[in-house]
A protein has these predicted regions:
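Mature catalytic core of soluble alpha/beta enzymes
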Residues: 2-13, 20-370
Length: 370
């Protein structure tokens, strides 16, 4: 079993889940809907994708066709959704040969970049972020499978093929003139599998914002399943206002209460939490956040981690990684990597039925009471 991760005293080098940070939205269903405020020029698109809802707001006299956003989100789903039987990631996960390669043309440029980002973040967090955790997620009943009897022997047997190391799971691409011609995957164990859920929605909001940027839109907010990226200002000329939930056990999307409002401009903000999705085993709560280094649900007292970063992919993935690391190791990480430009809010179990709040100076500077 891996020793606990420790970021204290290490020389610095520069560079899923259920999210709970949200813009205040009106839930919607079915096909995309929206409106246009003629006075402010604010356009809004609302819809459903990736098993959740999305909201896209931007200031422009010209409205973008809903299909542009719907098609992009569907493309991401076709590549990395574990709930679509024929998705690319499920084809990779089903590949049961260790003596040959699984190859494909990565024409959508989804899986290749996600793998590259995941490798970078895996190294940065010393394995706290790891998309090969999928078999453990299934073992603990937080994926498509029901939870069975789980003990040390079951965990140890699965841990034998967890890890972003070449002899367990490896991916490479051959690039030609800026176009990835072919991608191949090698498995060291046929049971190895990928799960990009802890980064895919953050990456998706980055892609959606890029659509807006390419059209010259300077002021926009994109939210998907609680993962948010903001550009410029809102219709009032102020930073976008994003609400962060209180980590109240048993709360739902309908009866949530807010801990604070955050002013966000030209950044992404994402949250991961443990207080809404868990199993109870013999009276003990088992978080859906699985520590890839131990194979067991994280049990460090951290209830919620909110991260502001330059991209949605980074904020999304690091929010999950910080839930694995816990509050103290997250603080050590922030000290070690100031060049990442992160601002973070942590809410932890105080051992007395409540929670303690800690925020980095940069996060506190842009936060206010709801």
């Amino acid at each position: 079993m891996r020793k606990a991760i420790n970021f204290q005293g290490i020389p610095a080098s520069l560079v899923l889940a259920v999210p709970f940070v949200a813009a205040v939205l009106t839930a919607c269903g079915g096909a995309a809907t929206g409106n246009h405020d003629k006075e402010s020029g604010m356009q809004q698109h609302l819809g459903e994708a990736q098993g959740t809802t999305y909201s896209i707001k931007y200031i422009s006299e010209e409205r973008i066709d809903d299909a542009v956003f719907e098609d992009l989100l569907d493309m991401v789903d076709r590549e990395v959704s574990l709930w679509r039987p024929n998705s690319r990631i499920n084809q990779i996960n089903a590949w049961d040969r260790t003596d040959s390669l699984f190859g494909f043309v990565d024409s959508t440029q989804i899986i290749g970049p996600l793998w590259a980002l995941s490798e970078e973040l895996h190294g940065l967090t010393k394995g706290a972020f790891d998309p090969t955790v999928s078999p453990l997620v299934e073992l603990w009943g937080f994926g498509l499978s029901e939870m069975g009897n789980v003990g040390a022997s079951e965990v140890d047997s699965v841990m034998a093929f967890i890890g972003m190391v070449p002899d367990r799971f490896d991916m490479n691409e051959e690039e030609e003139a800026g176009y990835y011609k072919s991608t191949w995957v090698r498995k060291g164990d046929a049971r190895a599998a990928l799960d990009f859920n802890a980064i895919a929605q953050g990456y998706s909001v980055d892609l959606l914002m890029e659509v807006l940027r390419e059209r010259g839109i300077q002021n926009a907010m994109v939210e998907l399943g609680g993962e948010v990226v903001c550009r410029g200002t809102n219709a009032s000329g102020d930073p976008w206002r994003i609400a962060v939930d209180r980590p109240i056990e048993g709360s739902t999307e309908q009866d949530r209460t807010f801990e604070m409002i955050v002013a966000v401009q030209d950044r992404a903000i994402c949250t991961s939490g443990s207080y809404r999705k868990y199993h109870e085993v013999d009276g003990r709560k088992m978080s859906h956040t699985i520590d890839p280094g131990t194979g067991w649900p994280a049990a460090n007292g951290l209830l919620s981690a909110t991260v502001m970063a330059s991209t949605g992919a980074y904020a999304d993935a690091l929010a999950t990684a910080f839930m694995v690391l816990g509050a103290e190791q997250t603080k050590a990480f922030l000290t070690l990597y100031p060049g990442l430009g992160l601002d973070v809010l942590l809410m932890s179990d105080d051992g007395q039925g409540g929670y303690a709040v800690w925020s980095s100076p940069g996060f506190a500077a842009v936060s206010s009471q709801p």
